[in-house]
Structure formats: structure tokens, C-alpha cells
Curated annotation (Swiss-Prot):
Keywords: Activator, Early protein, G1/S host cell cycle checkpoint dysregulation by virus, Host-virus interaction, Inhibition of host innate immune response by virus, Inhibition of host interferon signaling pathway by virus, Inhibition of host STAT1 by virus, Interferon antiviral system evasion, Metal-binding, Modulation of host cell cycle by virus, Transcription, Transcription regulation, Viral immunoevasion, Zinc, Zinc-finger
Motif range (LXCXE motif, interaction with host RB1): 114-118
Region named Disordered: 78-98
Superkingdom in the source lineage: Viruses
Biological function: E1A protein has both transforming and trans-activating activities. Plays a role in viral genome replication by driving entry of quiescent cells into the cell cycle. Disrupts the function of host retinoblastoma protein RB1/pRb and isoform early E1A 26 kDa protein stabilizes TP53, which are key regulators of the cell cycle. Induces the disassembly of the E2F1 transcription factors from RB1 by direct competition for the same binding site on RB1, with subsequent transcriptional activation of E2F1-regulated S-phase genes.
Biological classification of the source: Viruses, Varidnaviria, Bamfordvirae, Preplasmiviricota, Tectiliviricetes
Assembly and binders: Interaction with host RB1 induces the aberrant dissociation of RB1-E2F1 complex thereby disrupting RB1's activity.
Molecular functions per Gene Ontology: zinc ion binding
Motif window: Nuclear localization signal: 196-200
One GO term (biological process): symbiont-mediated suppression of host JAK-STAT cascade via inhibition of STAT1 activity
Record carries keyword Zinc: yes
Name of the protein this chain belongs to: Early E1A 21 kDa protein
Zinc finger (unnamed): 136-151
Amino acid sequence: MSRLLRLSLSSRVWLAAQEATRNVSEDPVVCRTPWDGSPTCTAVRVVRAEVLADGTMDLDIVFPEAAVQAVFSRTPWQDSTTATSAEEPSASTDSISSDPLPISCVESFEDMDLRCYEQLSPSPESIETIEVFPPCSTCGGHEVNGFCSLCYLRGLTDLLPQADDAGEAEVPDESAKDLCFMDLLTWAMEDKTECSRHDE
């Protein structure tokens, strides 16, 4: 079972998450979380992205159901194909109804509501086994009905507000295609904390 999450990110959080993935790849001590070292099938797959007039970005992303459980419990997650415990696979199947729930359109990342939108495959071992994501012949991203999220995100990067000191930095190939969900969640939580402090 995999989930599709629809959410909105502020451009600041989106760019910060991209920067976090660059830092993690260059410096292993940066942004250490229980999510570090998880298999690549936990990577977020962006299937739709749109920049709105107010500067926020609407995203549709797909990730394994077991990843949701790991985020909630803040514990490491092992791919069910390599896990020795029977608890992890059951977390991705037994806790979710077989009937898809309606998608939740949220106004901000901090207020996101994780819902099961559709079962993309009867019982995928990992998201990489789902055949609806053929590789893009242009960039190696993933196509959905002829739409390549990575090519589209590269085009959107130029539309997003850039920090003054980030003008010379280019988005690496993997940052748009394989953003870790825990990285996004961590940055969103920090963003919410900062907003709360300002309100006080």
C-alpha cells in the first residue's frame, strides 16, 4: 500500500528542504534524523507540482504507507523486503482500510492530514515496484501519464523566490526527484516552531 499526499509548501520550506538534501549528501553529520540510512524506496516521488499566485507550491507526492508509520513513531524504518521483523510489513497493510479515503487538500504543510488516497498497487513491496512511474527518457525522472515531475520541477525552480546567497547554486538532479519525507517534515516542524515564536 502506498499513499498519495496533497499539500502546500511555502517556497522557503521547499528551498530549505532542497538545501538540506544537498547538505546531507555533502556532509554526513548534517541534519541527522532516525530517517537517515533508510532504503531509497522511502524517497518522495513528486507526481504533480504547481506554483500558486501567493508563492506557495501545491504538491502531490507518493510514498510507502510504512513510511507514514515511521514518521508518526519517529523511528527508523526498514524496507519490508529486508526487514527481519514481521511488525513492519503489518504496519503498512493492517492499519489501513482497503477502501481509499478521499484526498485531503491542506492549506499548509504544518496542517497536513495524511490520508490514503488510492491504492496504487495491490501490495507493493516498495514504491519502486509500481509500474505507473516509467523512467523519463530525458532526465531519468518518473513519468505519470506522460508527465515528468523532475523536468517540471526543474522548470518551476526558476519561478520560486531565491535567497540572495543561493543564486549561484543549482538544484542537483536527485534533490527534486528524491526528497526524503522526513527531511520535509523536519523542516516544516522547524518552520512552525519559528512562526510560533514570532507570534509570542
